[in-house]
Swiss-Prot record:
Designated name of the protein: L-threonine 3-dehydrogenase
Top-level taxonomy: Bacteria, Pseudomonadati, Pseudomonadota, Alphaproteobacteria, Hyphomicrobiales
Pfam families given in the database record: ADH_N, ADH_zinc_N
Chain residues that bind Zn(2+) 1: C42, H67, E68
Keywords: Cytoplasm, Metal-binding, NAD, Oxidoreductase, Zinc
Reactions listed under catalytic activity: L-threonine + NAD(+) = (2S)-2-amino-3-oxobutanoate + NADH + H(+)
Length: 344
């Protein structure tokens, strides 16, 4: 194996990414080297491409970016015992310390010292990526490559949706991006009664309909209260999944929750905004912030969903070769796409 590889690198502190030749990562005794087959583009990668304020203060330059992927193990360190050469794998993109209180209690997703693959250390927009054995996840044979490549965002959706009991509940999802749609699909799969998803982007709303979400609301044209009345809801939503990061959507969600309702919040707002805390208090709402995936309970659940027949393939709207990565980023930046998967 050559000691150089192709990779998408943030080489300059400006808009864009560049295909470069960089050294193949060297592995330590507890590491696994993975040949990447497929990579998917995340919203985080778009922030890095755009070189916005968050990226400017977060990303060291140069940096190989990307964290949504699947591939094949090609080398393991001498202390690795759970994975072998030739194995199909994906990986948890949050590297945790293993030493803090939460890590030692089995709550790795709450680690205060988390490092992000493709953010704080070299990522998976490359021919090879190195991960600690702990972060590598085996992919069953009946899970397609392209689905395994989007397990990172699917995990965000599963973590958010499964934060609260969904059986027989009325669920509102704000934000019909890929994660919001997948969250709505999980809610339906888990036995929610009514699942309503809102957005203002017609392309994403159409995608939600194609993926079987029954009640799709264009918030720029319809009032949520009118939709609730038409579908027979009289007391408000039991569970909210906030995926948009948009102030009007979050405020509308709080207004439409039933007393005692529960809201899981994944959407990241571009700037701070106010909500009516009196409504939160007097309606006795339960608000829970969500970040990443529970390690590794969320991974077990999402593999089970796919093996149980949940078809995520329509959420992938663009399948391209890695040399066409600019087209993939253009699709993501437009807001008029589902997931974009790139083949190495």
């Amino acid at each position: 194996m050559t000691n150089m590889m192709k990779a998408l690198v943030k080489t300059k502190p400006e808009v864009g990414l560049w295909m470069e030749r960089v050294p193949v990562p060297e592995i330590g005794p507890n590491d696994v080297l993975i040949r990447v087959r497929k990579s998917a583009i995340c919203g985080t990668d778009v922030h890095i491409w755009n070189w916005d304020q968050w990226a400017e203060k977060t990303i060291p330059v140069p940096m190989v970016v990307g964290h949504e992927f699947m591939g094949e193990v090609v080398e393991v360190g001498p202390a690795v015992s759970k994975h072998h050469v030739g194995e199909r794998v994906s990986g948890e993109g949050h590297i945790v310390c293993g030493k803090c209180r939460n890590c030692r209690a089995g709550r790795g997703h709450l680690c205060r010292n988390t490092l992000g693959v493709g953010v704080n250390r070299p990522g998976s927009f490359a021919e090879f990526v190195c991960l600690p054995e702990y972060n590598v996840v085996s992919i069953p044979d009946d899970v397609p490559d392209e689905i395994a490549a989007i397990f990172d965002p699917f995990g965000n959706a599963v973590h958010t949706a499964l934060s609260f009991d969904l059986v027989g509940e009325d669920v509102l999802v704000t934000g019909a991006g890929p994660i919001g749609i997948m969250g709505a699909m999980v809610a339906k799969r888990c036995g929610a009664r009514k699942v309503v998803i809102t957005d203002i982007n017609p392309v994403r709303l159409d995608l939600a309909r194609k993926l079987g979400i029954d009640h799709v609301v264009d918030a720029s044209k319809e009032k949520l209260a009118d939709v609730m009345r038409v579908i027979g809801m009289t007391e408000g939503f039991d569970v909210g999944l906030e995926m948009s990061g948009a102030a009007p959507a979050f405020r509308d969600m709080i207004d439409k929750m039933n007393n005692g309702g529960k809201i899981a919040i994944l959407g990241i707002a571009p700037a701070g905004f106010e909500i009516d805390w009196n409504k939160v208090i007097f309606k006795m709402l339960n608000l829970k912030g969500i970040y990443g995936r529970e390690m590794f309970e969320t991974w077990y659940k999402m593999i089970a969903f796919v093996q149980g027949g949940l078809d995520l393939s329509p959420i992938i709207t663009h399948r391209i070769g890695i040399d066409d990565f600019r087209d993939g980023f253009e699709a993501m930046r437009s807001g008029n796409s589902g997931k974009v998967v790139m083949d190495w």
